[in-house]
Amino acid sequence: LPQAPKQDQNSVSPFFVIEADEYDTAFFDKRSKFVHYHPRTAVLNNLEFDHADIFDDLAAIEKQFHHLVRTVPQAGLVVSNGLEDSLQRVIAKGCWTPVEQFGSDSDWQAANPQSNGSFDVLFAGERQGHVAWDLLGEHNRMNALASIAAARHVGVSVKVAIEALSQFKNVKRRMEIRGEVHGVTVYDDFAHHPTAITTTVAGLRSKVGKARILAVLEPRSNTMKLGVMKNALPASLSEADLVFCYGADLGWDASTALAPIQHKAQVYNDLVSMVSAIVAAASSGDSVLVMSNGGFDGVHQKILDALTSKFSAE
């Protein structure tokens, strides 16, 4: 968070914000880490099957999320994504804390979204204000609604929350522009799950319109390396014009998985060849969207450097 204090700085604020972690606590405690947090305000944004190295199925993760919900006090608040069936099942297991939902047909809604990212905020059907920011995609609007609801619960007025979001600068590695060379823009995003890939590509598409998107993917997470999500990749990348996938060190064949979009997908097992192919394909007006939950061996700068060499030689 560019605008937040450094992690090692203590604040006089009584509030502490943490991203929940559903991985197991320790070898002797297989409960998810977040059952130890005991939050007063809990935001449940989305819940899908992931972390196949420790969870057998989605039901196992839902069970852990229900453990979390049960730790929120009666005077607290659960802010939940009303569009997620998995979260609806979690709440239905039993929740003794007030719940506010966000999303279409929910307590909190985003209305009149614009191509520049801005939108109106509705609560209980009443317009509360207008968020004027440049973050793209439905997932960012959902994040905004959740943060407004959570802030309201701890005493921040909706008006102030909306004003703060309008001044918000996006976090690192979320559609972060790493550079531009001769009209080719290189983005970096942490997306590594098919749903996140879908929303990230769709968000960029809403910004660039019909201009080309060159999606560059490293399936690096444990779940992706196991191949659990491989069949969902073609659909998640469908809005990209070209797809470059780094297939080294996978337990499955990326070319086979991407066969449904083979007309626009290329798989490489070495980074040098992949960067060369990306740069050869790129032209002015294109967006290169790099998606990985790791450093990807500095591929962003490699692409930018190679683009500089390409266009300076023309």
Task: Map each language-model feature to its residues.
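Extended acidic/charged loop-beta regions that coordinate divalent cations
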Residues: 1-49, 88-130, 167, 172-174
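Short active-site oxyanion
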Residues: 74-78, 240-243
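Short glycine-dipeptide loop
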Residues: 72-76, 284-285
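Active-site flanking residues adjacent to catalytic metal/cofactor-binding acidic residues
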Residues: 18-21, 44, 80, 188, ...
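Substrate-engagement module of ASCE P-loop NTPases
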Residues: 64-72
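ATP-dependent carboxylate-amine ligase
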Residues: 40-41, 66, 95-98, 111, ...
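Glycine/threonine-rich flexible loop motifs
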Residues: 27-30, 52-60, 224-226, 298-302
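Short, polar loop motifs at secondary-structure junctions
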Residues: 82-86, 104-105, 248-251
